[in-house]
Amino acid sequence: MEQVHHLTTRNDNFLCIPPLYHTGAKFHWMGSLVAGSKAVLLKGSKPRDILNAVSNELCTIVWLLVPWAQDILDELESGSINLQDLNLSQWRLMHIGAQPVPPSLIKRWHRFFPNHQYDTNYGLSESTGPGCVHLGINHTDKIGAIGLPGYRWQAKIVDSNFNPVPVGNVGELAVKGPGVMSCYYNDPAATAEVLKDGWLLTGDMAKQDTEHFIYLVDRKKEEKGVSR
């Protein structure tokens, strides 16, 4: 899915910074495998380490978390790092996710990287990670939204009776697609609470605008722990 969402080709080079126990890291990396392109695993997340890796390895796609992007911008704004010392012309896409993204952050980012494409997406472990909802690289006018249903995914906002809510109203985000889990291990009661006719109730409260872009509002529940 990430290969489709990011238009990844064999000429791309993906910089993976999060640890591979994170589903997002694994499945973003899988996009490179599907495309037959290069991927770089980076140990550490300091601004200079990230930018040096992009420069030295000629990375074209970088997945950042909000704190890492903020740290990079702080270093650039303070003058501690000079972009003229780095080879970053091939870097085309800044992908950011795993938490709400402030629109002000992306505006700051584009002051330093005006030619960067931007994308964010949404997912959870029960949906096999990211991609069930994503913004898309052509929708920078919708920064602040998590986006539209991803490739081969459906999404809707429902009330406590699993009925769709009107546009603009807050309800629980439900998703349906090829990555939805089969069950919680050894816990049929918990499984029945979140799986409804193939739909996964995410526990995230959200709303849609008139163009069907989805915005996260709040968290309904905490993560499910799994034990033997």
Q: What is the predicted role of each segment?
A:
Residues 1-5, 14, 50-53, 69-77, ...:
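Adenylate-forming
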Residues 1-13, 21-61, 75-76:
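Conserved AMP-binding/adenylation subdomain of ANL enzymes
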Residues 10-11, 91, 197:
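Phosphate-coordination loops involved in phosphoryl transfer and adenosine-cofactor binding
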Residues 34, 59-64, 73-141:
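Gly/Ser/Thr-rich phosphate-binding loop
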Residues 36, 54, 62-65, 162, ...:
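Residue-level signal for inorganic ion chemistry
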Residues 81-86, 154-156, 205:
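Generic short beta-strand
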Residues 98, 123, 147, 204, ...:
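Active-site glycine-centered loops adjacent to acidic/histidine catalytic or metal-binding residues
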Residues 163-168, 172-228:
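Conserved ATP-binding/catalytic segment of the ANL
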